[in-house]
Amino acid sequence: KGKVETILSAAGNIKLIFYSKEDCQKIVKEFPKSIMEIAPGITISQAVVKMEGDYAEFHNAVDELEKRLRVQRNRPMPSLTTGLMGIKRSNKTGLPAKEIKEGDYLDDATKAKRKCSDNSKLCEKAFGEALLAKQFPFNIGDITSHNDWIAIIHADGNGLGQIVQKVGKNKDDFKEFSNKLEQATCKAAQEAWNAMEDDIKQCYPIPLRPVVLGGDDLTVICRADFAIEYVETFMKNFETQTENLLGDILTQHKVFDNGEKKLTACAGVAFIKSSYPFYYGYELAESLCGKAKKDAKKQNSSLAPSCVMFHKVQDSFVEDYDKIAEREFKPNKDVSFEFGPYYVQDNIKDKPTIKHLLESVEKLNSEDGNKIKTHLRQWLTDLHEDKAIAEQKRKRVLSLLPDGELKELFKETTDMSNPKKTMAYDMLALASIKYQKTK
């Protein structure tokens, strides 16, 4: 009965202004129940701020709203699907079974996910067109090609918190910013897909499955061999599209001291086998994205440059990235195999670029390149045992290799003088993902 104004509705985030207390109370009471009935298992966090007194100004109300939401997220919500003892449960989720289909006991959440087969809107956002359902991969195994590796990509815009603080002082500007940010992210994803090779785009089913695309977030599952190229193109286009669509808003509100008119993004890529649990792969991708952001902020605290971290999961251990790095990337206290993140731009001092990484990996895809891969693997093994022996063998290999770009690549990659890190581990991991055939 009263007016309701939508300020933001994207990526699981909704902000509304109510001009009627009764309408607000009705939504707060009924909205969580309606969502959990449609999508069992989803949890809803809500908060309300009355725009008066200290919170009369829109930006102050939004700041307080975010604080209250953080409190609500830390409060456990009772499950509506625990069920009673003695009833049959889904073998996969442990929740009460509501249906048997093809021998599988399905709980409410699984039933809802399987029934939600219309992915046309998500396809249109990710690819620019609503693809036919039969073109869309539903089984992760259908995404793979010459080997069993898939990639989970999670990308996230940089510095949105500080940007919203400046833009969010005016609700109309904040609404426009949110809508155009959504457009920029979707267009960047579409351009990234359009830039892929024709043999990738013409695969059946499509070897890329969008999971989340909205706001400044992107999460996709894709075939592993083109994941780095895809995410590099996405980040480049995210910068371009945000400059085109948001440049005037960023300038008007003097968001960046240097007058920057674009946004940037960081990404994490988890390379996993198709049989590896998606949840753990996603957690790793999110952790890698956070690692990339942390390094990028050191380069420019105002607007962190776009970059990506990736990791190839080689075992069945389920642990966070820092523990993986400590276990796998530190052969001794003086050496690290952790060379990333890899940056989009080439003007970041002493930081590797995605372009250089991909060019280096491409050089390994030849008969002579295979010999270099063998030398690099042996050198990495020697580093675990004795750094001095590894250096002796390195010099011997260099003395035997003919002059050329492969010799220069080996020399550059194994030079541990400064910093005491090597790109060899990442190169070999990515080369095996892109070129190794196991099926």
Locations of regions flagged by a protein language model:
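Regulatory and interdomain segments flanking nucleotide-handling catalytic cores
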Residues: 1-439
